[in-house]
A protein has these predicted regions:
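Alpha/beta-hydrolase fold nucleophile elbow
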Residues: 128-139
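C-terminal catalytic histidine-bearing segment of alpha/beta-hydrolase fold enzymes
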Residues: 206-260
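Short alpha-helix in the alpha/beta-hydrolase fold that links the catalytic acid
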Residues: 68, 194-205
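Acidic catalytic loop of the alpha/beta-hydrolase fold
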Residues: 189-193, 222
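A conserved short beta-strand
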Residues: 155-165
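Serine-hydrolase catalytic machinery in alpha/beta-hydrolase-like enzymes
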Residues: 25-126, 226-238
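Short beta-strand/loop motif that positions the catalytic acidic residue
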Residues: 178, 184-186
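Gly/Ala-rich beta-loop-alpha elbow adjacent to hydrolase catalytic centers
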Residues: 138-142, 146
Length: 260
């Protein structure tokens, strides 16, 4: 059924603007913390369709993340951008972002997982979402978060990371709980999440007989999908328009395969 919906979505996307996509700010909770997510969908489509959870990079739920949600909605998915930090908690600069992200990535990562689970729960509640087709994608910090979510045994069919944080040294044993198909999209020259970390994760996935793909983009560093990262690879993070386009196409092909 969704294959027909997806074909219709692609036709509509070709003839209409993403301005036709409906968006909503959604308040929800994890424990006592109020969170503020962002929902995007195409109201012209009828029937249940796959839902995609999106987890933001370390700067929090920003316009970049919202744009990605609208793009996915334009492809026929119900997209929900989760809020890991909390309503009104948004870093003002990289220093603040680094400190805040570290709070979630340190230790056993229970809070990070709980916040990601809260976002997935909110997505599952949506009546437009096909509950057997739940996907999660994440950028940088968010890539780490969606992998940690998958490691809880969450009912995800697919997980995609874009230049994701790959340090799972304290949680690598939980790879055995992953039920999802996994796609890692990564810069071959990423100094913040080096190839050695990716290879450690890959070994664990291979040992546990997971279905996974790892794609490295040559000449590409961290944050390669984000134009605000600038264009100087020597800084370790830089936008790469070619890798951005290729990784987006890799994701869309992968999710289309999962939607059959």
């Amino acid at each position: 059924m969704f294959k027909k919906i997806l074909m219709l979505a692609l036709t509509l996307t070709a003839t209409t603007s993403l301005a036709k996509i409906k968006t909503e700010t959604v308040e929800y909770k994890q424990g006592d913390q109020v969170l503020e997510g962002y929902l995007a969908y195409n109201p012209a489509l009828k029937g249940a369709r796959p839902g995609v959870l999106i987890v933001h990079a370390w700067m929090g739920l920003d316009e970049y993340t919202k744009r990605r949600a609208r793009e996915l909605a334009g492809l026929g998915y119900v997209a929900f951008a989760a809020d890991i930090y909390g309503k009104g908690i948004r870093p003002k600069n990289a220093d603040e972002a680094g400190k805040l992200a570290t709070e979630y990535r340190s230790g056993d990562r229970k809070l990070l997982r709980a916040r990601a689970e809260a976002g997935l729960d909110e997505l599952q509640k949506n009546k437009m979402v096909e509950k057997n087709h739940l996907y999660a994608i994440g950028y940088c910090f968010g890539g780490n978060a969606v992998m940690e979510l998958a490691m809880t045994g969450a009912p995800l069919k697919a997980v995609v990371t874009f230049h994701g944080g790959m340090d799972f040294s304290k949680t690598i044993a939980d790879v055995k709980n992953i039920k999802a198909h996994v796609l890692i999209l990564h810069g071959a020259l990423d100094p913040y999440s080096p190839m050695e970390q990716v290879q450690t994760l890959e070994k664990a996935m291979n040992d546990n007989k997971l279905d996974y793909q790892v794609v490295f983009y040559s000449g590409t560093v961290h944050s390669f999908t984000d134009p605000s990262a600038g264009n100087d690879p020597s800084k370790g993070a830089a936008y790469n328009p070619v890798s951005d386009k290729r990784s987006f196409l890799a994701m869309t092909d992968f999710l289309q395969e999962m939607s059959k």
